[in-house]
Amino acid sequence: MELTVESLDSPALTKAQLADLLFDEIGLNKRESKEMVDAFFELISQSLVTGEDVKLSGFGNFQIRTKAPRPGRNPRTGEAIPIEARRVVTFHASSKLKEQIQEGTTGSAS
């Protein structure tokens, strides 16, 4: 049985499954497929850590945003506690991806 996104057992696509899909679709060997997937995500991670935005045309943008400090509250005790400033990753889907999701289609010609 050929592995396709539609045949996945779980609702989430894992890195291992992505590597298997590359193996099936492109013909890389399994080691090369895994290394390519790992390298792709490592490049995205490194870029975000250094503060660079990651723009994937037709897919979306990953950005680092700084959240300001704010007052918080311990839900158990009601005690006021400060929440420190922090950096968070945000993802904004491209118009093309949003359109594909609404239509239930993919960008591939299969």
Curated annotation (Swiss-Prot):
Q: Which UniProt keywords apply?
A: DNA recombination, DNA-binding, Transcription, Transcription regulation, Translation regulation
Q: Which Gene3D superfamilies match?
A: IHF-like DNA-binding proteins (4.10.520.10)
| An example Gene Ontology biological process | positive regulation of metabolic process
Which InterPro entries does the record associate with it?
A: Hist_DNA-bd, Histone-like_DNA-bd_CS, IHF-like_DNA-bd_dom_sf, IHF_alpha
What the entry lists under SUPFAM superfamilies is as follows: IHF-like DNA-binding proteins
PROSITE patterns on file: HISTONE_LIKE
Query: Listed GO molecular functions?
Result: DNA binding; structural constituent of chromatin
Q: Is-annotated flag, keyword Zinc-finger?
A: no
Q: Which residues form the signal peptide?
A: none
UniProt xrefs under NCBIfam families: himA (TIGR00987), PRK00285.1 (NF001401)
> What function does the entry list?
This protein is one of the two subunits of integration host factor, a specific DNA-binding protein that functions in genetic recombination as well as in transcriptional and translational control.
Its family remark reads: Belongs to the bacterial histone-like protein family.
Assembly and binders: Heterodimer of an alpha and a beta chain.
| Name assigned to this protein | Integration host factor subunit alpha
Recorded source organism is Delftia acidovorans (strain DSM 14801 / SPH-1)
